[in-house]
Amino acid sequence: MRCPFCGSDNTSVKDSRAAEDDTAVRRRRVCESCGARFTTFERVQLREIIVVKRDGKRSLFDREKLQRSILIALRKRPVDRDRIDQMVSGIVRKLESGGETEVPSSEVGELVMEALKRVDPVGYVRYASVYRDFKDPSDFAQFIEKAALEDEDDDADGK
C-alpha cells in the first residue's frame, strides 16, 4: 500500500479488525519511510455498478460519494459514525444484490431517503431538500406534511 503522505511503498500493517458489521476489514498502517499513520478499509466488491444520471450520463458508483452525501444530511445530528457506516453498507448491499449493472441515480436517492427516514427525520428532510430540489419554504412544508401523513399510515398499518 502506497503512503498517502510521502508516496512510499514501504508501509506495514499494525492492526487489523472487522468493521462495518463484519463487511469490511479496517487496517491501521504505518509508513516506514516517513512514519505517518493511516487507515485503510478492505471490502468485497460483488460487481461494478454504473449509476445513470438524470441527464443520461453514466459514472462508476462511488461509495465515498454516497457516504459524504449522508454525512452532509446528518451534520450536527446525534447519529454516530458506526450507524452511518451500517447505513451505507446496507444501501451498497441492496444495490449489489439487485443484479443490475446499471442503476438509475433516482434508485440510489430513494434508498438513501428510506434509510435516513428510519434513522433521523431531520437528516431525511435535509437530504430530500437537495434530492427533490426544493425551491422555497413551501416545498419543505409540503414534504413534511406528506411525510407526516405517511408516518400516520405506517402507524395504522402496524409498521
From Swiss-Prot:
One of its GO terms (molecular function) is DNA binding. Its cofactor is Zn(2+). It holds the Pfam family Zn_ribbon_NrdR. A zinc finger (unnamed) spans 3-34. Residues 49-139 form the ATP-cone domain. One of its GO terms (biological process) is negative regulation of DNA-templated transcription. Transmembrane segments: none annotated. Binds 1 zinc ion. It comes from the Bacteria. Keywords: ATP-binding, DNA-binding, Metal-binding, Nucleotide-binding, Repressor, Transcription, Transcription regulation, Zinc, Zinc-finger. Negatively regulates transcription of bacterial ribonucleotide reductase nrd genes and operons by binding to NrdR-boxes. Belongs to the NrdR family. This is Transcriptional repressor NrdR. It comes from Hyphomonas neptunium (strain ATCC 15444).
